[in-house]
Amino acid sequence: MADRGYSFSLTTFSPSGKLVQIEYALAAVAAGAPSVGIKASNGVVLATEKKQKSILYDEQSVHKIEPITKHIGMVYSGMGPDYRVLVRRARKLAQQYFLVYQEPIPTGQLVQRVASVMQEYTQSGGVRPFGVSLLIAGWDEDRPYLFQSDPSGAYFAWKATAMGKSYVNGKTFLEKRYNEDLELEDAIHTAILTLKESFEGQMTEENIEVGICNEAGFRRLSPAEVKDYLAAIA
């Protein structure tokens, strides 16, 4: 109750030491569709739920898993429009790095720069925090990377994690299933099974998306490939 008078101010701390708008942004993430990231020994998997609002909706018109460079990809939980802004910013940051250094941006560098953009929106007047958390997968220096970045601008490296609705169940499932010797194929199955833990209804190739990142680069799996993986775990 003591924080109520501070809930609309982004740049003022409440008496309990919180920026309440960031708490609300994290609530938007926790209410969003589940997303999962798993780092395998030879790559990274991103998977997310993508339920359609209507049977008339063209499911290929908007993707939740997006490539940023040839070797980095991203997914979100939370507010889609905010995510699209960050995708554009991330691509621009990657291009600027390439123009200066004439080499692809390392995954860690991109994560740091995107997180800095998100952090700026927690201490500026006239704006609000981004209502998304990001999972960023990459491959450089001959090894895979997986990071999560939150609305506060905090970022962490993960072996495997889940976010969005029912993220606690997802993380609990991953803690039981994950091991560091996991290979990419097994990681894809594990990611889909993690989504299935909290999935309501029939899971099909049309209502989930999967992306993989390995030494060949980052790509989204086609619906036909996702269908094959779903058949394998049925």
Curated annotation (Swiss-Prot):
Identify residues that carry Phosphotyrosine: 121
GO CC, one annotated term? nucleus
Pfam families from the UniProt entry: Proteasome, Proteasome_A_N
Q: Which Gene3D superfamilies match?
A: Glutamine Phosphoribosylpyrophosphate, subunit 1, domain 1 (3.60.20.10)
Q: Which UniProt keywords apply?
A: Acetylation, Cytoplasm, Nucleus, Phosphoprotein, Proteasome
Whether Nucleus counts among this entry's keywords is yes
Q: Which residues form a coiled coil?
A: none
Predominant localisation class = cytoplasm
- Name the family: Belongs to the peptidase T1A family.
Name the record gives this protein: Proteasome subunit alpha type-2
List the gene name: psma2
